[in-house]
Amino acid sequence: MLHDMSENHEKSSSGAANGSSFNEDNERNHPDSEALSLPSSVAGSGTLDRLVDTARDYARAAASDNTLRAYAKDWAHFARWCRMKGADPLPPSPEMIGLYLADLASGSGPSPALSVSTIDRRLSGIAWNYAQRGFTLDRKNRHIATVLAGIKRKHARPPVQKEAILAKDILAMVATLPYDLRGLRDRSILLLGYAGGLRRSEIVSLDVGKDDTPGSGGWIEILDDGAVLTLNAKTGWREVEIGRGSSEQTCPIHALEQWLHFAKIDFGPVFVRTSRDGKKALEARLSDKHVARLIKTTVLKSGIRAELPEKDRLALFSGHSLRAGLASSAEVDERYVQKQLGHASAEMTRRYQRRRDRFRVNLTKAAGL
């Protein structure tokens, strides 16, 4: 079993499979290229062809870029596995998919066994790719459902949660940043992400104003008492209110205003790249990977969990640490935290609360024991 193969390796392997009618490179990079087209009975025209392109753009926008990239990798891995077994991924075969899931879980190849959540995500990616090609994958088919149920029963483990970044931690992290342009930007990212309980993709997709760019994931309105972020999030459009802090050193809105002022940004992406010397803001929007790297770098520099080896410290913290930190630190009614994080249920919010009082309601005593 092969895992996380490079693009070049995929292309060379695809080229080697001359007997296969399946062009993996095209399928991987354009998974929905044939999903939308003119009916065979309709003659093409310039107007209709343009509408097909427009419809394809909307179809791609149905999922986030990160999700699409993950689904593309899922399909590439499954397609290569099929070729290695002398099979074709098209049309869908529940029997082959059941064997594939078993291979992922057993770790019988050179790569280690995958977690249940990763296997479940792989299956979702494969099903999505089949749907884009006009096929339906029945996940309830016994060859798939029973194998997956057995994998979950045998290998399921409690989810490994990332460490929450608490208020004292975020202050120590921003204290490691310089006061050049790049430092102002990164300080704003950390404070805004923490106070808003934002996902890293939500942070970098923000624009200054509504409809500034085609790829916008939302915009910011700065007011006297704080800022309102309108986000096109996983659960749909939502508003996040971020109030001003108790001091300029810790205020996310002040940090944002400082960054926008000195970077001379009044239109387009809020968080952009800077020149090598950190003195000039460029036009290119930051990647969400920058947020993850920023968190890990500042965690190390600030000495958080210094008693642990560096490798363990890096593994403990991620973009989700900001969201978990807000949920764990904010001493307010749970429903306000739930709204801020955009959770559909209070139970999901509680999963983010790393230090909540689990025994505030003691049913043992309430039952008379």
Q: What positions do the PLM features span?
A:
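N-terminal core-binding DNA-recognition domain of tyrosine recombinases/integrases
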Residues: 52-66, 76-159, 176-179
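Active-site/catalytic core of tyrosine-dependent DNA strand-transfer enzymes
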Residues: 245-312
